[in-house]
Amino acid sequence: PNEDCGEIEKFTRDFNYPAESCIKSLADLERLQIKTYFFSNVCAAYTRECYEAVGGFESLAIFNEDMVFAANAMKKGYKIAYAAEAKVFHSHNYNALQQLHRNFDLGVSQAEHPEIFEAVSSTGEGKKLVRLNCAYLKKKKKLYLIPKLFVHSGCKFIGYKLGKMHRKLPESLIMKLTMNKAYWAQRNFKNATKGINPHSGYGISSDERK
């Protein structure tokens, strides 16, 4: 974590990036669940062979493109190596509302990839993080931060659940909940221009010209 990182976020970084190195594969799915695919492109390196075999990152992604890539790589027989000795300074100082926005996008990304995330549990890791973070704050004698932890965790959970059900929400509400507004604009444009050949006429389809 960065020097200005708060105690709650500091523990979250340590929780996600532990001190022990490991190698993960699909064989770990039952044991690790969602953590099997945990992979952050903030501090990652890819071999060209693997990147090209998987087909690179998806062209349009709201969030989680790194975990989607990791899951697809594992399905092709690759493994993920986590090197605990590698160092990258990275952390966030999000407020509760920003946590809601971020986790809304997380929920959307999982809903858009049921072939990857439907079979694994995410909420179990979330509950474990809150429980261990509480113990950490007690040990640090910073009990006054526990209410903040609960508020932030609640916002994460609400955002995540809303993201998972985003197809049932009106677009106006989605735009208030998302952190990545550009994604929705790009997706709408992609859907609106689907089937149009830009090299035909003035960018209209053959059916429209008829």
Residue ranges and their predicted role:
Residues 1-11:
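Conserved donor NDP-sugar-binding/catalytic core segment of glycosyltransferases
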Residues 1-2, 21-23, 42-43, 86:
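Short, flexible active-site-adjacent loop segments at beta-strand->alpha-helix junctions, enriched
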Residues 6, 21-24, 33-34, 52, ...:
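Residue-level signal for pocket-adjacent positions within structured domains
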Residues 11-26:
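Short, flexible helix-coil linker/hinge segments at the edges of structured domains or between repeats
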Residues 25-46, 61-62, 68, 110, ...:
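A recurrent flexible, glycine/aromatic-enriched loop bordering the glycosyltransferase active site
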Residues 44-46, 50-55, 60-87:
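A short, conserved alpha-helix in the catalytic core of glycosyltransferases
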Residues 80, 86-159:
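Active-site-adjacent helix/loop segment of glycosyltransferases
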Residues 132, 151, 159-210:
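Juxtamembrane C-terminal module of membrane proteins
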